[in-house]
């Protein structure tokens, strides 16, 4: 997210505590917060999709649902042609 937008979120939060927000500012704050949260969710999803889980013996124990996503995106050498990957 753009640092200016984050600064604006913080500015509105500070103003809300000190003097309150107008209805327009409340709408702006809600939109900015939603944009921030969506970006955060995307980053977490991207991070999780890049994880490969292995046990103590080195066996891949990544959950099947995550493996399917990785196959679709071609991550970790997983292939849609090989369901065992």
Swiss-Prot record:
Region (Disordered): 62-85
Keywords, sorted A to Z: Cytoplasm
Organism superkingdom: Bacteria
Cross-referenced PANTHER family: UPF0291 PROTEIN CBO2609/CLC_2481, UPF0291 PROTEIN YNZC
InterPro entries assigned: DUF896 (IPR009242)
Gene Ontology CC: one annotated term: cytoplasm
Recorded family membership: Belongs to the UPF0291 family.
HAMAP family in UniProt: UPF0291 (MF_01103)
This protein's name: UPF0291 protein SPCG_1462
Principal subcellular localisation of the protein: cytoplasm
Keyword Cytoplasm: yes
Keyword Zinc-finger listed: no
Location of the protein in the cell: Cytoplasm
